[in-house]
């Protein structure tokens, strides 16, 4: 028998979509994880703007994953500045994906998604 998870607290994914190739990989990995049901991609800019509904949903999350493409750690810093400290952090450069040298292809997106998947489980 299956268990209803309709009222379960969400697992939220905040990628820094950035302006580079690793930003695109972060974004596409978050979308892939959302499609697979591992979590829900959510609005990083809404945290920066302290949008009430986004802040409340994030406070109620059962898990939070920040995905950053590079060492600037924009997603991590945005979460911290919004008052969140308990979250998993994935930096694509730690997976040897270098800014300006990492095409947003299926292999790189899956590599990032696999790492994110394990951090959310």
What are these regions (language model features)?
Residues 1-121:
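Iron-sulfur-associated redox domains of electron-transfer enzymes in respiratory
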